[in-house]
């Protein structure tokens, strides 16, 4: 296992090896085409995190329908100011950026560890949009987070670029406060960590964070806020392409034709440029 100094697991060696899986990696995601305003969905400020960093601004849309405990924890710690000043202390090139440590090497908050939320149960209340079936289930989105749902209704997030998740020790029920942001597709991580959201603004910032374990000059989160807590005059308005709209349907068809059997939801970029 690969661990931090305190033993916190981020990725198993096998998972790192799968950074170059036999399945073809997604090409550069196909960006959302020009589309009318009705094809775009505004991100709810109450369900988004604004992360100011030394490299720029990141917005993560939260996914409480997938991981309600993790989302509640992230919001609680954010509102305490817990993440302000935290380092990106473990950053693997072309893979992920891990943060939540202020240099004290405690690796956790004073709150109890969280129960693993590697999967979720799709119900009538789940804000799920299907984009097509696969063997034994269905592919779709919960908000901006790509997911797969089995025939039995059990769903799990796909580890596309921008996905936000929580690391843990050997015991899967030990996620607490730290998180990592994916820089690329990593299908081997599915159902092994709790996914709590996805970057909808600033993936370029995530990829610009200085690499290293630890980096020689680590970047940090200077300030983290729930987007709804940001004064309206300062609050960025973030929109993503609605996967239930016609523009998305065209994007999906175009991308599936281009990628053929190598198609993945990670090939799709829902951010684009909203009107």
Name each region found by the language model.
Residues 1-4:
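Positively charged n-region of N-terminal signal peptides that target proteins for export
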Residues 7-17:
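Bacterial N-terminal signal peptides
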């Amino acid at each position: 296992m690969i661990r931090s100094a305190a033993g916190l697991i981020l990725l198993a060696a096998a998972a790192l090896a799968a950074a170059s899986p036999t399945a073809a990696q997604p090409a550069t995601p196909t960006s959302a085409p020009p589309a009318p305003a009705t094809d775009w969905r505004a991100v709810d400020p109450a369900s988004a995190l604004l992360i100011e960093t030394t490299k720029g601004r990141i917005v993560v849309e939260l996914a409480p329908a997938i991981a309600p405990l993790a989302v509640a924890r992230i919001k609680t710690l954010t509102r305490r100011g817990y993440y302000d000043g935290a380092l990106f202390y473990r950053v693997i090139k072309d893979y992920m950026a891990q943060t939540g440590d202020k240099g004290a090497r405690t690796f956790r908050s004073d709150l109890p560890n969280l129960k693993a939320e590697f999967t979720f149960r799709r119900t009538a209340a789940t804000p799920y949009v299907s984009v097509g079936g696969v063997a034994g289930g269905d592919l779709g989105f919960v908000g901006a987070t790509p997911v797969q749902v089995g025939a039995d209704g059990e769903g799990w997030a796909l580890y596309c670029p921008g996905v936000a998740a929580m690391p843990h020790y050997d015991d899967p029920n030990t996620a607490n406060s730290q998180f990592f942001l994916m820089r690329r597709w990593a299908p081997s991580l599915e159902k092994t960590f709790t996914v709590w959201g996805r970057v909808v603004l600033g993936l370029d910032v995530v990829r610009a964070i200085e690499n290293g374990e630890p980096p020689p000059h680590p970047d940090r989160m200077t300030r983290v806020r729930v987007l709804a807590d940001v004064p309206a005059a300062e609050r960025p308005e973030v929109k993503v392409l609605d996967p239930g709209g016609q523009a998305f349907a065209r994007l999906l068809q175009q991308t599936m034709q281009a990628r053929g059997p190598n198609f993945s939801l990670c090939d799709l970029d829902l951010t684009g440029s909203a009107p």
